[in-house]
Amino acid sequence: NEENCIKLFNKHKKIDLLINNAGFGLFGEFSKTNLDKELNMIDLNVKAVHILTKLYLKEMIKKDSGRILNVASTASFLPGPLMSTYYSTKSYVYELTTAIFEELRRIRSNVKVSVLCPGPVNTNFNNVAGVNFAIKGLSSDYVTSYALDKMFKNKLVIIPGFTNKLAKIACKFASLRLLLKVD
């Protein structure tokens, strides 16, 4: 919640790197999924990322250094039927981070932001979300090392794995009608 984000910030103001990597998903038709769980998801996946990014970004801009890595998902490029709230939260993280990147560029700041957009990763996410992906997930070690390498090379959008990169490209050219059929 907001109070915990502010407490965390006040306790650890002086950091050089923020990685916003908390999140969970929920599988099911939007009209049937639990509203309280969805609001908790929005609090964690959107509000916490937003608050922590804003608080730490202000401090980083003051000292003109620092990095923020926000974790979105390849889900941020798709509508996401049956996981609509999760996909929407990840779209928010993606769009927020890319907008901040441009704002930092315009003020010629040395602060860097990146957004990580992995596809399925071998974690406990599937169990919590109640979903099984058709494609095999990447190892968390691979995603971590890839993300850090690209982040320190100042890459804005970081997409690990050939299949995930291909999926993002395909999304640019596919019709919305076709994307809505992806599950």
What are these regions (language model features)?
Residues 21-26:
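Conserved NAD(P)H cofactor-binding loop of Rossmann-fold oxidoreductase domains
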Residues 53, 89:
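Active-site helix of classical SDR
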Residues 80-84:
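Active-site loop immediately N-terminal to the catalytic Tyr-X3-Lys motif
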Residues 1-7, 35:
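The beta1-alpha1 cofactor-binding region of Rossmann-like NAD(H)/NADP(H)-dependent oxidoreductases
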Residues 29-30, 37-42:
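Substrate-binding pocket helix/loop in short-chain dehydrogenase/reductase
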Residues 115, 132-168:
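C-terminal helical subdomain
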